[in-house]
Amino acid sequence: MSAAQVSSSRRQSCYLCDLPRMPWAMIWDFSEPVCRGCVNYEGADRIEFVIETARQLKRAHGCFQDGRSPGPPPPVGVKTVALSAKEAAAAAAAAAAAAAAAQQQQQQQQQQQQQQQQQQQQQQQLNHVDGSSKPAVLAAPSGLERYGLSAAAAAAAAAAAAVEQRSRFEYPPPPVSLGSSSHATRLPNGLGGPNGFPKPTPEEGPPELNRQSPNSSSAAASVASRRGTHGGLVTGLPNPGGGGGPQLTVPPNLLPQTLLNGPASAAVLPPPPPHALGSRGPPTPAPPGAPGGPACLGGTPGVSATSSSASSSTSSSVAEVGVGAGGKRPGSVSSTDQERELKEKQRNAEALAELSESLRNRAEEWANKPKMVRDTLLTLAGCTPYEVRFKKDHSLLGRVFAFDAVSKPGMDYELKLFIEYPTGSGNVYSSASGVAKQMYQDCMKDFGRGLSSGFKYLEYEKKHGSGDWRLLGDLLPEAVRFFKEGVPGADMLPQPYLDASCPMLPTALVSLSRAPSAPPGTGTLPPAAPSGRGAAASLRKRKASPEPPDSAEGALKLGEEQQRQQWMANQSEALKLTMSAGGFAAPGHAAGGPPPPPPPLGPHSNRTTPPESAPQNGPSPMAALMSVADTLGTAHSPKDGSSVHSTTASARRNSSSPVSPASVPGQRRLASRNGDLNLQVAPPPPSAHPGMDQVHPQNIPDSPMANSGPLCCTICHERLEDTHFVQCPSVPSHKFCFPCSRESIKAQGASGEVYCPSGEKCPLVGSNVPWAFMQGEIATILAGDVKVKKERDP
């Protein structure tokens, strides 16, 4: 006998489904042998009722176990008793009544099926139920339909739609058993206990099945693993026939796949997180029901058909970012966004690097450029910043804040403009086409298309709030961008506007130095340049600090910002007196130098022209802050086109400490006495040149620089070299030659604290503590081989 024949002979037919089963798959605890599948399908609490109904139908229709293998042999001594005619008639009558009831139930179900036909069709499209998991009753109608169970199966299938709104673990109170009322509560898989049977009480003892089938738990677990995570039934379905009848128990293979994968609450698309790039919004998900959108099940909004199990990271990421265009699920949605974000960061870093390079080299490069290029840049720079917007979507705003001219070897100069978009975001674009492309992508959600010329898609506002928007290409036509023609007339130039909500320009983040803005109400001096380099430097520095002092927080480092605020608080009054009491007029620019840029307009009226470009300010403390960007040791002399000294151009910044002379030749950074700020000092020979930090109003009339007189030692009144002398950081008029400083140090004693050579204990800025020389400074001043060159008479 072959193995197949042996296996076939061992199989037994289930009383309900009529399919051959192995002995371990059969359950003998009921009146008829049934398989575990039928018990799980019908439920352990009503399987006896189904067996009885099937028995009556079989007797009525003559469907007996003719070709089936017999069940377990009856015990020895028990004889099979044939039914009498009276019993057969009673059974036939009962079967007829059951058949009539089943027929009536089928009619009711057909009406409900017609009403829910559309809904079921939609479910079939959305829910890809595996065909192999469909119950045998659908594949073989000759099985259960002839037993009258098709009505219950159809009712369960029709009621599956109502379950879609319920979570997998949301179960109603346990249904009342049809056979008895003593069953325990049902488990989440729809069964009353282990193996689908109620858990026995201690008085009842273990059920018979546990004694006969010790491996039933593992068998049930294997069935559950083959069927997926839902090895049992899902209860809680309302009775499709209405009324207060018992709730149905539906097998998992009749439920939509979305309900088996996870709870309905997990299917709701969460709001997407805010985008990392500026104010650009995230992709808008498709509307419910649309291809690729979160289709709603059963007409209930908020329940997505794309939900997945909680452990499925791929599906959850798709639910977060939405479904891709065209109804397709992109395989790497998150990776695509990450790549795009990474490219955007790289592009912004490159643009900031270009801006930093432009600001760093502007002083030298602009002075060496042709006159047409220089004049155009100065004119355009005097109009910044001003707002621009996208022509097709007026809500997309940016601002132009800087210009430059670039050229490749053998090529003509071409205008480069720097645009911040969105306004206040810090994202910098170095071309009009780049920002126009980004605006187009934000507007149209098209990441693949580029624009030919950004000047055709950008508009600028001539005056803020006027509503007079003009095409940027009209202001900057191709002839102007290549410096073939000059900038159009003044009627085309925009007026500068600085938004109070986002005053910090990207130039403040990359510029090497910033001049603190003057207090509100301070007048603006027209810039004057003693040389071409000075004019370009003044333009760069004016551009580097457009923000008012009360709104500069957030973009600078905390320490630097605190020093700036302290510096401005101490210098505000002195700065006013420097410009008002002095009453200087701006001298004309040097011959051959570039013309001065136009005075700032609009909100720029409260800005202060850097003192380096206006040497009439004399020892203005702003020079100390501005001169860091200049090359060390290149201070302007009186021969550079101005009759006044520009010693302040070589003054070094110090906000809260005495400024010391250089301790060693060459460029060196000396730590200040209180360690707050590194001090940059440099002349090539050993020198003592402290930078100025505080301007006392009462000392301004006595200052040689303010009076346009020569530099003289305060003690011996000898003329000083304009870059080599000892400067008191507190009192501008305290200037000393090296011999007098040397004598003062020796008189005070070099081993102790050495104060100002004037004999006074000049206090530090903002405190009563006097400043004193550092040991390195003392050693430099006491060096005997230092020969100081005296200034000759003009």
From Swiss-Prot:
Gene3D superfamilies: Interferon regulatory factor 2-binding protein. It catalyses: S-ubiquitinyl-[E2 ubiquitin-conjugating enzyme]-L-cysteine + [acceptor protein]-L-lysine = [E2 ubiquitin-conjugating enzyme]-L-cysteine + N(6)-ubiquitinyl-[acceptor protein]-L-lysine. A zinc finger (RING-type) spans 713-760. GO terms for molecular function: transcription corepressor activity; ubiquitin protein ligase activity; zinc ion binding. It comes from the Eukaryota. SUPFAM superfamilies: RING/U-box. The keyword Phosphoprotein applies. There is a cross-link at K79 (Glycyl lysine isopeptide (Lys-Gly) (interchain with G-Cter in SUMO2)). Pathway: Protein modification; protein ubiquitination. Residues 605-619 have a biased composition (Polar residues). Residues 216-225, 302-322, 520-538, 646-665 have a biased composition (Low complexity). It is found in: Nucleus. CDD domains: vRING-HC_IRF2BPL. It holds the Pfam family IRF-2BP1_2. GO terms for biological process: development of secondary female sexual characteristics; negative regulation of transcription by RNA polymerase II; positive regulation of transcription by RNA polymerase II; protein ubiquitination; regulation of transcription by RNA polymerase II. Disulfide bonds: none annotated. GO terms for cellular component: nucleus. Residues 172-345, 513-554, 583-669 are annotated as: Disordered. Residues 282-291, 593-602 have a biased composition (Pro residues). Residues 230-246 have a biased composition (Gly residues). The keyword Nucleus applies. Its EC number is 2.3.2.27. Probable E3 ubiquitin protein ligase involved in the proteasome-mediated ubiquitin-dependent degradation of target proteins. Through the degradation of CTNNB1, functions downstream of FOXF2 to negatively regulate the Wnt signaling pathway. Probably plays a role in the development of the central nervous system and in neuronal maintenance. Also acts as a transcriptional regulator of genes controlling female reproductive function. May play a role in gene transcription by transactivating GNRH1 promoter and repressing PENK promoter. This is Probable E3 ubiquitin-protein ligase IRF2BPL. It comes from Macaca mulatta.
